[in-house]
Amino acid sequence: DNPNHSR
């Protein structure tokens, strides 16, 4: 999971 991949 990448928590910094939110758009």
Curated annotation (Swiss-Prot):
Annotated catalysed reactions: choline + 2 O2 + H2O = glycine betaine + 2 H2O2 + H(+)
pH dependence text: Optimum pH is 8.0.
Modified residues (Tele-8alpha-FAD histidine): 5
Top-rank lineage group of the source organism: Bacteria
Transmembrane segments: none
UniProt keyword Translocase, yes or no: no
UniProt signal peptide: none
Listed GO biological process terms: glycine betaine biosynthetic process from choline
Keyword list, A-Z: FAD, Flavoprotein, Nucleotide-binding, Oxidoreductase
This protein's record includes keyword Ion transport: no
Cofactor(s) demanded: FAD
Cofactor binding description: Contains 1 FAD per subunit covalently linked to a His residue.
Pathway: Amine and polyamine biosynthesis; betaine biosynthesis via choline pathway; betaine from choline: step 1/1
Entry's Gene Ontology molecular function annotations: choline:oxygen 1-oxidoreductase activity; nucleotide binding
EC number: 1.1.3.17
EC class (word): oxidoreductase
Functional summary from the UniProt entry: Oxidizes choline to betaine, probably via two successive reactions with betaine aldehyde as an intermediate. Accepts either choline or the reaction intermediate betaine-aldehyde as substrate. Glycine-betaine accumulates to high levels in the cytoplasm of cells to prevent dehydration and plasmolysis in adverse hyperosmotic environments.
Protein name: Choline oxidase
